[in-house]
């Protein structure tokens, strides 16, 4: 961390700043996941340092995405979860993605649907349906994260799942799963019994 900060302040002593960041955010992961506005509250962290720190998880996310893209057939909860995990790496707020699949369960696209709180009102069904139709998807997997909690479905998650399932069915598209991510863990609402297994139909 000290070496990284040096690139933002090459003439300064970055050791105290590195220690201050770790003291405030607890771990390296905490530092790299912190919002830019919170990073700049630490003495010695200016715009350049905050932007550089926030760049690290973005680069890591891209590297992990390129690795997960090697999973060709996404026909199980495990494969879908592993494919989607990198999209949430380093995110400090809730984000929603829609993984669009063709008839052979190959990824067509993974679309950012929403950033912010997850509920029926915030995730417009028409936006999800449009993204699925634009990708010419046969089925889709909805995914969102719980950045400060456990990967467990809330009542709102279940309600959102059922609303979107009905909206997608109306245009002939299967909601194959709704995956919830927290850190490096994920759970499936299909495995939870909220959705039928489309691969057993």
Segments the model singles out, each with a brief description of its role:
Residues 21, 28-42:
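A short amphipathic alpha-helix within small helical-bundle interaction modules
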Residues 1-8:
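Charged, compositionally biased N-terminal leader segments and the immediate start
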Residues 81-135, 139:
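Histidine/lysine/aspartate-rich catalytic loop segments that bind and position anionic ligands
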Residues 124-126, 155-162:
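Charged helix-capping and loop-helix junction motifs
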């Amino acid at each position: 961390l000290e070496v990284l900060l040096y690139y933002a302040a090459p003439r300064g002593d970055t050791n105290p700043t590195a220690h201050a960041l770790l003291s405030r955010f607890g771990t390296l992961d905490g530092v790299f996941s912190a919002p830019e506005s919170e990073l700049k509250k630490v003495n010695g962290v200016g715009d350049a340092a905050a932007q550089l720190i926030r760049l690290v998880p973005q680069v890591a996310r891209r590297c992990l995405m390129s690795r997960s893209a090697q999973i060709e057939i996404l026909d199980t909860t495990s494969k879908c979860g592993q494919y989607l995990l990198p999209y949430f790496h380093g995110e400090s707020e809730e984000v929603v993605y829609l993984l669009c699949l063709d008839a052979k369960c190959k990824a067509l696209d993974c679309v950012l649907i929403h950033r912010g709180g997850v509920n029926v009102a915030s995730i417009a069904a028409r936006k999800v349906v449009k993204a699925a139709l634009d990708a010419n998807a046969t089925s889709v997997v909805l995914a969102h994260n719980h950045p400060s909690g456990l990967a467990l479905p809330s009542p709102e998650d279940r309600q959102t799942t059922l609303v979107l399932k009905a909206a997608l069915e109306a245009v002939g598209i299967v909601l194959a799963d709704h995956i919830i991510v927290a850190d490096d863990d994920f759970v499936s609402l299909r495995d939870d019994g909220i959705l039928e297994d489309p691969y057993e139909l």
